[in-house]
């Protein structure tokens, strides 16, 4: 993660963090392994999972873990029961007054999501 992205994570201390957990499943007929990322912020469905800076960092770490393997044939992503995710954590950004941090947050989101195209 870039230095500016790390600054975004440090500057949002009260974020409800969406964790990205990876499980692996062997595909039939020797087709390889599927990595399944589950997004969950630890809250019930009334607080949907969002992507704040630390949540994006967690997703980025999960993608790093998957990218380090040579047996991955498919990557899937799912959410907690009843809801997938609603997008950027705008409540976290409402606490930020520095436009450079807000821009870094947007760049971080684009950088992490772009990685899905690398698989």
Feature roles, as predicted:
Residues 1-78, 114:
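Conserved CoA-thioester-binding segment of acyl-CoA-metabolizing enzymes
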Residues 119:
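Internal glycine-rich, Lys/Arg-flanked active-site/core loops of soluble domains
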Residues 41, 50, 78-114:
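Glycine- (often His-adjacent) and acidic-residue-rich active-site loop
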């Amino acid at each position: 993660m870039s230095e500016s992205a790390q600054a975004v994570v440090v500057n949002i201390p009260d974020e409800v963090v969406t964790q990205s957990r990876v499980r692996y499943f062997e595909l039939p007929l020797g087709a390889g392994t599927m990595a399944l990322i589950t997004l969950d912020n630890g809250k019930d469905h009334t607080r949907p999972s969002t992507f704040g800076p630390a949540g994006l960092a967690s997703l980025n770490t999960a993608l790093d873990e998957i990218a380090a393997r040579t047996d991955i044939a498919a990557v899937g992503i799912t959410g907690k029961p009843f809801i997938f995710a609603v997008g950027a954590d705008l409540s976290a950004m409402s606490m930020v007054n520095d436009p450079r941090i807000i821009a870094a947050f947007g760049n971080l989101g684009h950088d992490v999501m772009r990685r899905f195209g690398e698989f």
